[in-house]
C-alpha cells in the first residue's frame, strides 16, 4: 500500500471518534465546569505522559516488525519479549501514580472542585496506565505489518469509546471521578478490541523473554524513551504550569483550544503513522528520499487549508463547541496554537525519516536540548502574559523544532548520498 492510501485509512480511523469527541468534550466542559474540565484534561495528559513506561518499545516494535515481516522466528521473539516486559513495567508505573497522586493534586492548586473527588479520580487513573501501554504495543504490531485497515477499525472503536463513554458517566454523575471511571471502562473495551485483532500473534508468541531481543529493542527504544520522557513534558506541562501559577480554574481556557489542536492533530498523525513503517522497510536510499519528499508535500497541501480555515473561524468553533466563555477567553490562544500546529505537522516527516534510518538518538538529543530553554520560556511567558504566553511559548518551540529537524535531515541526506 502507498503512503497516501495508508494515510487515508488512518484518517478514516479517526473520523468517527472525532465526530463523537466534538459533542462529548463540549458536554464535559459544561457538565464539569471550567475548573473540573481543566483538571480532567490534565488527567488525560497524565495518561499520555504514562507513555514513558513503554521505554520506547512500541516505536521499536513497529520498526522491528516492519524489518522482520517475513521472519517468523524473529517476529515471535519481538512480540513475546516486548509484551512480557511491558506488562510488568506498566504496572510499576501505575503503582507510582497511585503513590504520588495526592502530591500531584496539591501541585495543581485546585479551589472550586471537591478535593476528595479529585484525589479519588487520580487514584483511579492509575488503572489506565497498563491498559494504555498494552493497547499501544498491540496496535504497534499491526502498524509494523502496515495493516492499516485493521488498525483503524480497532482505533475507531477504541477512540470512540474513549471520547464518548466519560461523557455518559458524567451525565449520570457530574464528578471528575465519574469521568475517570468512564475513561477506565473505555480503556478496558479498547484493550479487548486490540487483543482480539492480535490474538493469533499473542497465542503463537507466548510469554517468553529474550534478553538479546530486548537489548536490540531497547537500544533503539532507549533513545525513544528519552524522547518519550521529554516530549510529553513539552506537550502537556504547559497545563500544569498554568494551573500552578494561575490556578486550576484558568486551565480550561487554555486546555479547550489545546484540545482543538489535539483533534486537528489526527491529520498529521494519520500521515506520520503511515510514513514511519513504510520508510523503515525501504532499502534503497533514493526511493527513501522520494517517499520523504512526497510525504512532506502531502502534509503541506493537506494542513495549509485547515490552518487558514481555522484562523478565520476560531472564535465560532470555540463558541459552538465549548460555549461563549471560551470564545471570549480562548480565541487568541487558538490562533497562536494553530500557527505552531502547522510547523509541528510538517516536522513529523523529517522526524519519522530520521528515526526510520535508526537515528533515534538524534531526535532524543534534540528534545534534550530543547527542554530547559522551553520550560524557562514557558514559565516566564505564563508569569508575564498568562494563557497567551503559554500558547506563544509552545508555538515558538515547535517552529524551531521543525526547522532544526528539517536541517538535520537534509544534512543526513548529503552524508548518505555521498
From Swiss-Prot:
GO cellular component: plasma membrane
Family, per entry: Belongs to the polysaccharide synthase family.
UniProt function note: Could be an O-antigen transporter.
Alphabetical keyword list: Cell inner membrane, Cell membrane, Lipopolysaccharide biosynthesis, Membrane, Transmembrane, Transmembrane helix
Taxonomic lineage from the root: Bacteria, Pseudomonadati, Pseudomonadota, Gammaproteobacteria, Enterobacterales
Keyword GTP-binding: no
Cysteines joined through disulfide linkages: none
Short name of one Pfam family: Polysacc_synt
Membrane topology label: Multi-pass membrane protein
Gene that this polypeptide is encoded by: rfbE
Protein name as it appears in the record: Putative O-antigen transporter
Chief location: membrane
Subcellular location: Cell inner membrane
Mitochondrion found in the keyword field: no
Entry superkingdom: Bacteria
Spans through the membrane: 8-28, 37-57, 85-105, 124-144, 165-185, 217-237, 251-271, 297-317, 334-354, 362-382, 385-405
Gene Ontology BP term (one): lipopolysaccharide biosynthetic process
Pathway: Bacterial outer membrane biogenesis; lipopolysaccharide biosynthesis
Amino acid at each position: 500500500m502507498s503512503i497516501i492510501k495508508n494515510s487515508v485509512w488512518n484518517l478514516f480511523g479517526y473520523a468517527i471518534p472525532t465526530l463523537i469527541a466534538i459533542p462529548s468534550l463540549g458536554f464535559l466542559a459544561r457538565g464539569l465546569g471550567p475548573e473540573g474540565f481543566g483538571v480532567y484534561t490534565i488527567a488525560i495528559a497524565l495518561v499520555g505522559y504514562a507513555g514513558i513506561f513503554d521505554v520506547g518499545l512500541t516505536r521499536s516494535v513497529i520498526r522491528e516488525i516492519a524489518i522482520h515481516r517475513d521472519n517468523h522466528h524473529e517476529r515471535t521473539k519481538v512480540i513475546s519479549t516486548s509484551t512480557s516486559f511491558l506488562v510488568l513495567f506498566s504496572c510499576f508505573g501505575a503503582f507510582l501514580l497511585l503513590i504520588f497522586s495526592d502530591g500531584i493534586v496539591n501541585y495543581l492548586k485546585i479551589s472550586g472542585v471537591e478535593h476528595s473527588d479529585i484525589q479519588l479520580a487520580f487514584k483511579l487513573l492509575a488503572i489506565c496506565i497498563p491498559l494504555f501501554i498494552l493497547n499501544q504495543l498491540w496496535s504497534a504490531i499491526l502498524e509494523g505489518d502496515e495493516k492499516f485497515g485493521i488498525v483503524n477499525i480497532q482505533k475507531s472503536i477504541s477512540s470512540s469509546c474513549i471520547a464518548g463513554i466519560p461523557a455518559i458517566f458524567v451525565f449520570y454523575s457530574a464528578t471528575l471521578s465519574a469521568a475517570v471511571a468512564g475513561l477506565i471502562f473505555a480503556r478496558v473495551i479498547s484493550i479487548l478490541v486490540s487483543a482480539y485483532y492480535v490474538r493469533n500473534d499473542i497465542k503463537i508468541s507466548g510469554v517468553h523473554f529474550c534478553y538479546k531481543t530486548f537489548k536490540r529493542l531497547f537500544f533503539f527504544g532507549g533513545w525513544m524513551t528519552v524522547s518519550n520522557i521529554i516530549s510529553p513534558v513539552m506537550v502537556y506541562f504547559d497545563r500544569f504550569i498554568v494551573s500552578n501559577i494561575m490556578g486550576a480554574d484558568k486551565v480550561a481556557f487554555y486546555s479547550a483550544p489545546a484540545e482543538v489542536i489535539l483533534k486537528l492533530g489526527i491529520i498529521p498523525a494519520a500521515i506520520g503513522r503511515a510514513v514511519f513503517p513504510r520508510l523503515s522497510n525501504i532499502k534503497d536510499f533514493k526511493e527513501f528520499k522520494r517517499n520523504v519528499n512526497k510525504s512532506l508535500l502531502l502534509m503541506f497541501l493537506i494542513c495549509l487549508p485547515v490552518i487558514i480555515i481555522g484562523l478565520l473561524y476560531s472564535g465560532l468553533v470555540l463558541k459552538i463547541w465549548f460555549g461563549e466563555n471560551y470564545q471570549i477567553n480562548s480565541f487568541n490562544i487558538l490562533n497562536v496554537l494553530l500557527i505552531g500546529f502547522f510547523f509541528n505537522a510538517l516536522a513529523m516527516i523529517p522526524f519519522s525519516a530520521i528515526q526510520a534510518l535508526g537515528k533515534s538518538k538524534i531526535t532524543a538529543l534534540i528534545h534534550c536540548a530543547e527542554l530547559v530553554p522551553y520550560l524557562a520560556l514557558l514559565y516566564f511567558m505564563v508569569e508575564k502574559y498568562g494563557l497567551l504566553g503559554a500558547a506563544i511559548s509552545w508555538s515558538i518551540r515547535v517552529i524551531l523544532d521543525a526547522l532544526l529537524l528539517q536541517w538535520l535531515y537534509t544534512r543526513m541526506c548529503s552524508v548518505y548520498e555521498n
